[in-house]
C-alpha cells in the first residue's frame, strides 16, 4: 500500500480504479477531494503525476513510440494563416479563465505582431466529427502558417504533422517543442528532428494498455 491518491469520477472510472489496484493506491471520488488542500502526491486521469499534462521531458527509449507507428512529418512552411484551436471550456475554468475572454485577448495579442489572417477552429464536442469528418490535418493543410492554442492536444498533433505551434497554458504536453511567446508568431519554433523524436518517445511512455494499469507496470514506469 502506498500513499498515492487516485481520483475516480463517482468511483466508477475503470481505468483509474485498475491503476489504483495495480499500484496499491487509494481511490477517492473526484467530487470528494480537493487536491489543493492535500500534500499527498496524486494521479489525475491520463496518468500524469501532480499535473494536467506531461510538460517536462523525460529521456525514454523509443520502443513504445515505435509500436504506435505514428509518423513524424517534416516541417511544412509557406502557409499564410494563423489557426487558433479553441480549447475546451473545462480546463479554462480550472485555471480561472473565461474562454471567450482568452480567445479575444489572444487574437488581440497576435494582431500586435502580424497582419496575417487569423482563423478560429471551434472545438467540436463529438470526437468522431473532430477526427473523421472535420480533421485537424485538413485544417492545417489549408494554407496555415502555425497553430495557436491554450492546452488543446491539437498542438501535439500539429507538431507531429509538421506545423509549428504556440501553447499558452501553464502546462502542456507539447511545451518542449512549441513556443509560448506570441511575439515570435512570425518566426515560430522549429525544433530539430532529434528533439521531436525524443519528445514523442517521452509522450509514449505516458500511454498505457489496461493490462499495464492492472499489473503495476504503469505505476513502475511512472516512478522511474
Regions found by a protein language model. Give the residues of each.
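Active-site and donor-binding regions of nucleotide-sugar-utilizing enzymes
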Residues: 1-47, 134-138, 154-155
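Generic beta-sheet signal
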Residues: 2, 28-31, 121, 150, ...
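Structural motif
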Residues: 2-3, 81, 145-146
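Short, solvent-exposed loop/turn segments at secondary-structure junctions
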Residues: 10-12, 33-35, 87-91, 124-127, ...
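Leloir-type glycosyltransferase catalytic cores
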Residues: 36-79, 175-224
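Conserved catalytic-core segment of nucleotide-activated headgroup transferases in glycan assembly
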Residues: 77-127
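Donor nucleotide-activated moiety binding/catalytic core segment of transferases
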Residues: 111-166
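Gly/Pro- and small hydrophobic-enriched strand-loop and loop-to-helix capping segments
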Residues: 162-180
